[in-house]
């Protein structure tokens, strides 16, 4: 649905991510577009991308959620990944990235969103076998180290493998 290709060019030209975000771009713009897309549209987009992967010889792809940023939408994205994975010879490794950024509707309630990810999203994804990994984005404008620890502890308690990507944007 939403893609950040135009923002990639801005980053190559030296524009800081914060400036792109303030101009209405960034992860939140992609979240809005992704939330509006139907499962069928998301499946079509994913099928096209996987076809490109296979054409270039890829045999494995980790595919992350992270553009729904609420339980219902993150589950929708992981279901799409799981369904399309059944149609391809490429090994698809789904990853829950519900802790990508705090969505705008939780901007003044960060604590509530961290709880939602740790106590609602992670257990539901685990129970329904929708993801292999749980990932957290710890960086400026994303999650703090302590918030990341809390979410990853929730995954650890369920024996889900954990990932962290950090300092992607920070100086």
Where in this protein do the model-derived segments appear?
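Metal-associated gating/positioning segment near the N- to mid-region
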Residues: 1-45
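Metal-coordinating catalytic core of metallo-dependent amide/deamination hydrolases
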Residues: 26-47, 51-54, 59-169
